[in-house]
Amino acid sequence: MLFCPIVEARVVCTSALRLHGAEGAIPLSAKNLGELMLKPIRWNTFIRDFFVIQIGFLLYGLAIALIVRANLGTGTWLVLEVALANLLEIKIGTMTVYMGFMVLILALILREQVGWGTLANILSIGPWLNLFLDFISTSKENPALQIGMFLLGVLIQGMATAIYIGVDAGAGPRDSLMLAVHRTTGVSIRVARGAIEVIVVLIGWLLGGPAGIGTVAFALLIGPSVQWAFKLFKVHLHKPELAEAAAD
């Protein structure tokens, strides 16, 4: 059987799969495949980690709600999610949950490792988003307020990202897909992320999603916001590819 140490699962198992395909000498069991794809849970810190990660997801939902209500344009994935939510006549947060599961399935098909935090990400951010959208009003006629809400949303999203990634319980579904594309195609993180987001925002825009100047501003500002938050909370990334993704 193929044994894959979890810490280096992505590198070791990918290499072993190539050897299996070339030489037919290394069988891969369903159990080991599960170990490859599922990040182990640290039970001794699980309660603390769960509490901290939920704070991150609460802030993430607040950040997205502020950006949506600023009415200047949203982040790339939200352009598509808002468009689909309008077409299906469901809440944006609910569509965020559905989209998270669809993206997760793609990442799993590409054999990307996920953790309990990945599932918590999908199930938690959407409900928080729906809650905050019910309480925050749309701003359309006060440019100063719109810009302020947008910038505050970007700042809070950077903090939320640093908090939940700092727990190290698994990347979100969209980051998992990005890493899977990077690993399976050999393209850089920047190219993988850029290609995915261009496709997503184009489809969302064609479906009537809220692409605008805020979409461009978000793309330019979210990287510095996340980097600042990483330094603020002293978050250290153990995987080089995640460090590069956070910097983008």
Placement of each model-derived feature along the sequence:
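Short, Lys/Arg-enriched N-terminal segments with co-localized hydrophobic residues
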Residues: 19-36
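Core subunits and conserved enzymes of cellular information-processing
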Residues: 32-248
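Intrinsic structural disorder/low-complexity segments
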Residues: 5-8, 23
